[in-house]
Amino acid sequence: MEPGSDDFLPPPECPVFEPSWAEFRDPLGYIAKIRPIAEKSGICKIRPPADWQPPFAVEVDNFRFTPRIQRLNELEAQTRVKLNYLDQIAKFWEIQGSSLKIPNVERRILDLYSLSKIVVEEGGYEAICKDRRWARVAQRLNYPPGKNIGSLLRSHYERIVYPYEMYQSGANLVQCNTRPFDNEEKDKEYKPHSIPLRQSVQPSKFNSYGRRAKRLQPDPEPTEEDIEKNPELKKLQIYGAGPKMMGLGLMAKDKTLRKKDKEGPECPPTVVVKEELGGDVKVESTSPKTFLESKEELSHSPEPCTKMTMRLRRNHSNAQFIESYVCRMCSRGDEDDKLLLCDGCDDNYHIFCLLPPLPEIPKGVWRCPKCVMAECKRPPEAFGFEQATREYTLQSFGEMADSFKADYFNMPVHMVPTELVEKEFWRLVNSIEEDVTVEYGADIHSKEFGSGFPVSDSKRHLTPEEEEYATSGWNLNVMPVLEQSVLCHINADISGMKVPWLYVGMVFSAFCWHIEDHWSYSINYLHWGEPKTWYGVPSLAAEHLEEVMKKLTPELFDSQPDLLHQLVTLMNPNTLMSHGVPVVRTNQCAGEFVITFPRAYHSGFNQGYNFAEAVNFCTADWLPAGRQCIEHYRRLRRYCVFSHEELICKMAACPEKLDLNLAAAVHKEMFIMVQEERRLRKALLEKGITEAEREAFELLPDDERQCIKCKTTCFLSALACYDCPDGLVCLSHINDLCKCSSSRQYLRYRYTLDELPAMLHKLKVRAESFDTWANKVRVALEVEDGRKRSLEELRALESEARERRFPNSELLQQLKNCLSEAEACVSRALGLVSGQEAGPHRVAGLQMTLTELRAFLDQMNNLPCAMHQIGDVKGVLEQVEAYQAEAREALASLPSSPGLLQSLLERGRQLGVEVPEAQQLQRQVEQARWLDEVKRTLAPSARRGTLAVMRGLLVAGASVAPSPAVDKAQAELQELLTIAERWEEKAHLCLEARQKHPPATLEAIIREAENIPVHLPNIQALKEALAKARAWIADVDEIQNGDHYPCLDDLEGLVAVGRDLPVGLEELRQLELQVLTAHSWREKASKTFLKKNSCYTLLEVLCPCADAGSDSTKRSRWMEKELGLYKSDTELLGLSAQDLRDPGSVIVAFKEGEQKEKEGILQLRRTNSAKPSPLASSSTASSTTSICVCGQVLAGAGALQCDLCQDWFHGRCVSVPRLLSSPRPNPTSSPLLAWWEWDTKFLCPLCMRSRRPRLETILALLVALQRLPVRLPEGEALQCLTERAISWQGRARQALASEDVTALLGRLAELRQRLQAEPRPEEPPNYPAAPASDPLREGSGKDMPKVQGLLENGDSVTSPEKVAPEEGSGKRDLELLSSLLPQLTGPVLELPEATRAPLEELMMEGDLLEVTLDENHSIWQLLQAGQPPDLERIRTLLELEKAERHGSRARGRALERRRRRKVDRGGEGDDPAREELEPKRVRSSGPEAEEVQEEEELEEETGGEGPPAPIPTTGSPSTQENQNGLEPAEGTTSGPSAPFSTLTPRLHLPCPQQPPQQQL
């Protein structure tokens, strides 16, 4: 069976060791410890502790190397034998003029080597044919039976192998035509192996890696192209019988061949024997035939296609040539036309003298049988690795390696299993079909390129961490030169042995079976990268492995006996194991060590891109193996790396520097070496060589002191000759020096035979010094002579072991333990004596007991050393025993005096030793102290003790010595504690109970608990709570009986305090109800005034705006309203908390705030009026540019100016008035072109801070406030606001009732009536100048015209507060208004400056009020009519109205689609019908929608109560009787005079008396 044909079976794993940190600190010691186990496997793996991670010290950027080229199937021994065999056959057929083609049988290449070998084993070709055993041959080649494969193999053997085997056996065969054999499978051409040729040509580039065999591609044949082109070569063409031979050089250059080989495409695995002559007939050989048959076949041989002429004869004038011009067979020179000249040796043969004879002169190059045989039997050249031509960095090599592996396995490199790589590797090395080539950066000198470990040198500064690893024994630069290592005594830096080598690997790169130089140890560390797979064989099986490899591949070892020392040969571990060789394996991962032991064969390969470092080291146990290795090298005639004798002598010269174990091993080796040297020099004397001279061999180069016979490096002695000065031999080969006489030969020696024993003696003294010392120690420890040594003598022995570096033996450990124990005893004895001197101040817990003292004395007596402290310890023991007797006597005579017991106890403490009786004395003393403490605690005159003290006494009483007095005291304590805990629990329940008890109940509990003589915390807390409750009741009585109603803050504080008290208070419920009612009123007032998500508090809205003049303050407040930074009541009114309780102070502060607000708004109006209009300004911000509340600069159309502060805002950012609807409750129709009545008035959100409810709504809040027995700041502010509004209303009515204003209002009324009479609103009339005396016939309500007044067909539209306008009508209304804008003219009134100024001032003051008044709208209409219509504002309002209506329609359609989807899905969620019924105005977005929604919410919340009857105003039925609508009917009361007069007493001020025209 072909080795490796089956799947690879991994060998067992080698031992793996994981040392602890303590073991890891001594590398060679740990290796010696594990050697008995690991040596049995040959290799082992060591995993360092997890924290040991040396940094990678190689300079990556400067690291450049040239790798070796490895062809995998040339590494394996058996595969190389096959390849060499195929090369020989190929060479044979190539000489014959044909190229080898290997046939395919059963879809695999026929193994010609195995076929030839099996044929020989079965008895040869003739025997197999005779016995018809070709089927057995097929079976042994693992071919399936029953397919007539035997016959197929026979034909292949006959035509390919048999002619070569016959030539090898010496038969004379010439080229003959054989019958062609038509095979069903295509043969495959074989490319000759030619290892020497490959080593001399340029290597292929790495981008041409191929998985299939390049050797199986067509080999470029010797071409005739060069011959045809070169006329000189054309003249040298030789014609004659026989095939051409390669020796003439008529072929393409190697460079051309290599180029074709690289550039040629991959071909399927085929092998052929190709006819080189260019003919159609294949030149094949069959079994030998008779001469006549061969002659007959040759006569029918076709002529070759190559045109050739007869060979030119040589110059006949050459006599020597004429003499040699005879046939070598018959020695005749006649019939020269039948004479053939060999192209190889120039011998002549008659064509009829050859066997078989040739019918005619063959054309082309012809070789005689002798030359063919010589060429085929030429020995192969030694195999070795060739170097690549490309230089790599680590990065470029890694990229190449990873790319190769990923492409080969078709997966990422980290995902390829190690088992798969291992099987594929051994498959490739066993394959002759596939030729995979890899590169391996092996044996890179760390001295030149730098080590992977940190190195302590002057090249660069090391960090503390690097310094630690640079000195570590596991650093491969340090390990070979450790003190216990042999190699530290070699001065030279031996690369690979003392100086580490570096290895940069890629997948499949391998190191072959080998052992280390001089059979030394080796250690390999994998710095990083993918694993490295190792195989190892123990040293006991080393010779067996060599025998197996020689047996399986004798062809290799015949030509290279030291093949295994060349690191170029692999053999499948399964093959070795099948022949009984024990093999182990391991995968070395990054950060792990692999150690190989002496003469342990090992090999392996890399799983991928990695970086490793290796070095050799030798320990004392290696010395015998090193000596045996020299003898082995002598037999193989292999060069030594260093002289073993020199190493031994150098160590023997300085024995004191040697480790003791090493000295013993060196002594043993030195003794053997001296005995051998005596024997060899004696043999010289017997031969008669007496001349000698001293030679310092260590000063000579190694190549000048090598034995010319065995290549051993000489040191102790060598034999030289005066007449042959160029060579010398070791004393083992004295007969191989030269043929000169012995008298001319002389001995060259390093030491005399007298000097060697002296060196040996020094080694013996060093080795035996340990035995002498050990004997002294043994006598001292065992006191064999009856004399105890002093402590100083034992210390001297230990110091001697340390100074002479004795090994850490068991005896040394016993000595150290003895010294340690003795020193501890001395220290303890000194402490005992010093403790007595310290007396009671000695440290507690360090005293020894009496038993320990006696044991300590016995321990000191048993130690093998004398100590004078023993006497002191004996004295202490006597004192303690005397004290013990006295204490026993005192305890026996109880009851004794407590003072006597205490003094006796103090004396015992001074001894420094614990006596058992001392504990009894201590307990008696503690009992007396406890009884005294109980008496003091229970005494009537004593301070009441706490529960914790009583519990502590009970606990302490349980530990004192029992007695009747103790039992009685414990019973009294327990009874008192039980009663106290019961009352304490009752008080706790009163404090924690949800149902609070009245003060009377708590007083009763406290009175009863006062009789208990114990401090009770809960009772005390109950007392304090009761006192606080009484104080709280007093505060309530005081605040309720004051001059004014209590403030809400005071009530809230009392309620908070009362709720925290654990006492039931009747007044608390009443206060809580008052506070709740006040909060309810405040909430209702907030909903009435405050907008949704308002940034103002209710009090801020009701009070005058203190910062009305600061635009930036108002804006920042508006933009940062989410921060909730509201001012307190005192900040708003500028009053202290005490002043807020005085109503008079509140009113005065409110009045002052009104004045500040008015002054501030005037200043703000002047500032804002000075700003440029955004309708004409640019978008660039400046110090005078208006900025909207959104923070953006105002520019272009769409901006509105506030009628109060005169500042500008984006229409989309604020609430704007609506032209097509009126929010008034009683609207009246107005003509379409009465533009002055359109609702175009705009107040910004900074000026209009609240909802501005009507006065009747405020009066309802005041009526509810009147019923509250609580004062609120908001209530008083609301009263002040109401007074301010009524005051302004009176002044406004007075102004409207003047003659000038009444006339102007009359003209407006007349003009409105005239416009109502117009038939077509599309054709507005030209307005005449309004007469100055037209009276005002209608009321001055603010109500703007309804939408139906604007429609051409008079359709009515419901108010938008309830139902959204219809889509069509609203659109037509907007279009109508837009078309009427060009027709608006004005002003329609002429207002004199004397009339306009007061009205404008009244208008400004009215806009400052957070109350809605009809007079305000009347004044605004009058001022509007006195100026031209603001067409720009009207257009802006129309555009905003259109945009809002468009958004409402879109939201309505989206809502309908969402409702339908929910209906289709049947899903749950919000009721779509409810959403549909909601006003679209409410669901719209923007500030206007929010205000409408807030108004509707307020109406729903206040709908139950409702405001009182509206106050009659101008235009209402109650005032229509009066022309000016200002004076009430005689004897009637109008306005809020009566309600206000009832509210005023809450402020404790008289109701203001107003003139009749100012009252409502």
From Swiss-Prot:
* Location of the protein in the cell: Nucleus
Q: What is this protein called?
A: Lysine-specific demethylase 5C
Q: Changing Y751C: reported impact?
A: In MRXSCJ; impairs enzymatic activity
Recorded GO molecular functions are: DNA binding; histone demethylase activity; histone H3K4 demethylase activity; histone H3K4me/H3K4me2/H3K4me3 demethylase activity; zinc ion binding
Cross-link Glycyl lysine isopeptide (Lys-Gly) (interchain with G-Cter in SUMO2) maps to: K205, K229, K244, K274, K295, K1127
Query: How is the co-factor bound, per the entry?
Result: Binds 1 Fe(2+) ion per subunit.
The extra comment attached to this record reads: Escapes X-inactivation.
Encoding gene, per UniProt annotation: KDM5C
Q: What is the effect of changing P480L?
A: In MRXSCJ; patient fibroblasts show decreased enzymatic activity
Residue spans, zinc finger C5HC2: 707-759
Please note every region of biased composition (Basic and acidic residues). 1335-1345, 1464-1481
Q: Which family does it belong to?
A: Belongs to the JARID1 histone demethylase family.
Start and end residues of each ARID domain? 79-169
Give the protein's function. Histone demethylase that specifically demethylates 'Lys-4' of histone H3, thereby playing a central role in histone code. Does not demethylate histone H3 'Lys-9', H3 'Lys-27', H3 'Lys-36', H3 'Lys-79' or H4 'Lys-20'. Demethylates trimethylated and dimethylated but not monomethylated H3 'Lys-4'. Participates in transcriptional repression of neuronal genes by recruiting histone deacetylases and REST at neuron-restrictive silencer elements. Represses the CLOCK-BMAL1 heterodimer-mediated transcriptional activation of the core clock component PER2.
Instruction: State what changing C640Y does.
Output: De novo mutation found in a patient with intellectual disability
Which positions does UniProt annotate for 2-oxoglutarate binding?
A: Y440, S522, N524, K532
